[in-house]
Amino acid sequence: MSIDRSETLSAVRALFHDYPCRYWIAGGWALDLFAGRVRRQHGDVDVVVLARDLDEVARTFTRPRPAVQNPETGECRPWAPGEQLAPGPNALVFPDSLHPHPIQILFAASDAGEWVYHRGRGTIRKPLDEITLRSPDGLPYFALEIVFLFKFCGGRSKDNDDFADVVELFDSERCCWLFDCIALCYPEYSWLPVFC
């Protein structure tokens, strides 16, 4: 299917129309945007915002107000006004009936103009402008190396399939950056030989 006609991405665009801060499509949909086609079916769409912008998220998304979900267990609870959420353990989700695919908001750590990998103890970072790619119609999405930095620690078969499907689209600079990050955090990881 053509990425241009995706109802899911149109729903994200409409949902974030009034959101004044940075956001990115992440996960498998970001890879689809980079490849220019829908490569496989998706169960949901991940949208990442900066954790420092949580107050703006609360002001923008009020009807309906999203719920807090634990991505590991799927358990949901109401999001209390003023409650702070950290990168990693929580996501915000909207009622499934509102969109073609469930949309979840994930949080990224940052430091001034840099994105910070929250699993890397602050040592893995990249300028926000470098991690931001845009579709032909302007939809922001994470660069490949950022998507795979999160996917490589999951060990899921769909993540391995995603990697095999788009690894040849990497340019050398992004490839080397990802290699260095994986080698630093997980020196025995199975994707490393692909880079060598």
Regions found by a protein language model. Give the residues of each.
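Compositionally biased terminal segments of proteins
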Residues: M1-C196
